[in-house]
Every structure is written in C-alpha cells, then in structure tokens.
Amino acid sequence: MINIAGKLISNKVNNIRFFLNYPKIDIEEENDHVQQFVEVVNKSIKNEVDIFEDIVINTYFEENIIGNVNAISEFQIAFNRGNIISMPMEFTQIIGLTDISHIYSYNYDFNLMKKITLNDIFK
C-alpha cells in the first residue's frame, strides 16, 4: 500500500514568501528495490521543488522586482490504487496581480518500478 503525506516548506527570502507543499511517498513493501525506487521518486519530487524555489529567487533578483512575491506549490492525489499513483502538482508564482503557473504530473507504477507515460496507458 502506498501512503502519501504532505511536506511543507514555509520560509521568507527578502520579499518572497514560500509556501511549498509537496508529496512524500512511503510504501509498505519490504523489497529493497521498491524502497530504493521510492527514494528516487521522492528525491526527484523534492528536486523539482528546490529548482522552483531557486528560479523564483533568481528571477526576483535578476529582474529587480519591486513588491511582494508569493511562491506556492500544491499537489493532489488523482489516483492511488494497486501500487500505481498519479499526482498533479502546481507550481505558482504570484507577483502583484500577475500569476504564473506550471502543472507537472507525477505518474508512477511501483510494481514495474517506472514512470508511467501516456504511451504506457494507450498501447
């Protein structure tokens, strides 16, 4: 069984406020290969969050943004059955009234230990 818990990064850098909510996956499986795959997936998700945070900070300083910036990430569990998960995650940067969003979907099959693509679904 796959358990998905939310982790939160909440901090402030200059006038940038971060509320980065991201998933941490845990699986009740004793197989070492599956556990290693779970760690790879968790590191990949955390890496995406870190990259988003870095991009927001770099953009703020490079473009000399005046005013407050809010950087937010949220995820939803769209599917979690039979060791297959699908979680869309939205990364949003709000500068004044301007909203820039990017949605990325994490789709994994922990039985096959691989990322699922549309080609896998529609064979």
Question: Predicted regions span which residues?
Answer:
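Compositionally biased intrinsically disordered regions enriched in Thr/Gly
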Residues: 1-123
